[in-house]
């Protein structure tokens, strides 16, 4: 009864008004799964290929009708008749059908849409929530959220170099309390920014995007907001950064335009981070070095890797092969997991398993171009990741993931687990 009878893709819009792909998979029993594919702004060069049409006369060249056609005309014929519960088999079938390293023939967006819709259809078939279907009976840990409350870099039209300034309500007793704390700090930050005469418009991920005097001022106003909301920085709430350094790196030099000394070598940039870590309760830095600056990554890991979580995003692009190379070289101690960087659920789960075995933490992440799809919320609980990064406390494309986690926490009830500060097991070596 779990045989696939139909697969259908359509073009929809993401949170930035750009086209993306939505896929529906129907089963013989009448069960159905629907999945929408996200899209990134700052992307790693080794990410799986997001197939766009390139027709400048339509959606400025960003249409995805080619990917839609690849699902409806090519992939559908191959997977119809297969059992939806055979996730690995279906994903392998699509990988073989594409035959390229970065899924450039069919498009990672086409493949991922089908992969996730299949999992959702199978979950619907057996009457389980998606997190239960993927994770089994041991899926019970609600993630500590990284909440992006000030946006900069490629995610905002302002003068802030660092792409994301985040809060982590690590002192919360459960996910619902963590969400409340984050929301209260978000509103306090708006008041702090207004009082200083700063713009309170928001960026792609729902965080505020003011022009500030320096990158450090972003940390200062966040600290003020945490205190204003009635919480203690470093005790109730920790800080995290996503620098997106590949966007700042050219000809062996990092350029932070909003700093007194804009151009920095890798060593000088690590000095900059170390100074911030000494002054503020920063627990995590993502993409602190450019994706191809492996020497810089090694130095940063050696200097800061026992004090803070060092997350590889553009560095690893959710790719098990690249992650293994990083593990072997002792680079970073955490991986950001983005479904569309690798393009199938199976490969995503492989990367998570590899990271955990190596003692690396995993952070399940959204993209800056999101939809109302809440798969990543379920995924974070399914694999007991312990951390999730899904934007600020406004914009429905971000909040829908938080709301799904509230539902899951309710459903798990007494068996729900929330570890708070204990999620940073990579710092206990």
Curated annotation (Swiss-Prot):
One GO CC term on file: cell surface
Amino-acid positions noted as binding (2R)-2-phosphoglycerate in the UniProt annotation, renumbered to this chain: 163, 338, 367-368, 389
Pathway: Carbohydrate degradation; glycolysis; pyruvate from D-glyceraldehyde 3-phosphate: step 4/5
EC number(s) stated in the UniProt entry for this protein: 4.2.1.11
Stored PANTHER family: ENOLASE
Job of this protein: Catalyzes the reversible conversion of 2-phosphoglycerate (2-PG) into phosphoenolpyruvate (PEP). It is essential for the degradation of carbohydrates via glycolysis.
Alphabetized HAMAP family for the sequence: Enolase
Protein name (database record): Enolase
Organism field: Geotalea uraniireducens (strain Rf4)
Phylogenetic placement of the source organism: Bacteria, Pseudomonadati, Thermodesulfobacteriota, Desulfuromonadia, Geobacterales
């Amino acid at each position: 009864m779990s045989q696939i009878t139909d697969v259908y893709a359509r073009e929809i819009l993401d949170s930035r008004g750009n086209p993306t792909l939505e896929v529906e998979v129907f089963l013989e029993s009448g069960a159905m799964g629907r999945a929408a594919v996200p899209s990134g702004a700052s992307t790693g060069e080794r990410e799986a290929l997001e197939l766009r049409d390139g027709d400048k006369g339509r959606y400025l060249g960003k249409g995805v009708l080619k990917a839609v056609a690849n699902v409806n005309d090519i992939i559908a014929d191959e997977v119809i008749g297969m059992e939806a519960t055979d996730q690995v088999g279906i994903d392998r079938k699509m990988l073989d059908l594409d035959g390229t390293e970065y899924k450039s023939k069919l498009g990672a967006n086409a493949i991922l849409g089908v992969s996730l819709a299949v999992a959702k259809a199978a979950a619907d078939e057996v009457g389980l929530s998606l997190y239960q279907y993927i994770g089994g009976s041991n899926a019970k840990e609600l993630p500590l959220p990284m909440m992006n409350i000030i946006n900069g870099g490629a995610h905002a039209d302002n003068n802030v170099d660092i792409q994301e300034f985040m809060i982590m309500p690590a002192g919360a007793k459960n996910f619902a309390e963590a969400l409340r704390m984050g929301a209260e700090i978000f509103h306090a930050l708006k008041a702090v920014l207004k009082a200083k005469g700063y713009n309170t418009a928001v960026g792609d991920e729902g965080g505020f995007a003011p022009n500030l005097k320096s990158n450090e001022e972003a940390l200062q106003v966040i600290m003020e907001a945490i205190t204003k909301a009635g919480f203690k920085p470093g005790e109730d709430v920790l800080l995290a950064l996503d620098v997106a350094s590949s966007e700042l790196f050219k000809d062996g030099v990092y350029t932070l335009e909003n700093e007194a000394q804009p151009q920095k070598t890798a060593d000088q940039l690590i000095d900059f981070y170390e100074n911030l870590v000494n002054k503020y309760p920063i627990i995590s830095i993502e993409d602190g070095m450019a994706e191809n600056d492996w020497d810089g990554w090694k130095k940063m890991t050696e200097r800061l890797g026992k004090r803070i979580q060092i997350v590889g995003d553009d560095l690893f692009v959710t790719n098990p092969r690249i992650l293994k190379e990083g593990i072997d070289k002792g680079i970073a101690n955490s991986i950001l997991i983005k479904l569309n960087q690798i393009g199938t659920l199976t490969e995503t789960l492989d990367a998570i398993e590899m990271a955990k075995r190596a003692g690396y933490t995993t952070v399940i992440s959204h993209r800056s171009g999101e939809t109302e799809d809440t798969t990543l919320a379920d995924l974070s609980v399914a694999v007991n990741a312990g951390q999730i990064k899904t934007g600020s406390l406004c914009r429905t494309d971000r909040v829908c993931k938080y709301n799904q986690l509230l539902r899951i926490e309710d459903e798990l009830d007494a068996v729900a687990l929330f570890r708070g500060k204990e999620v940073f097991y990579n710092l206990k070596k």
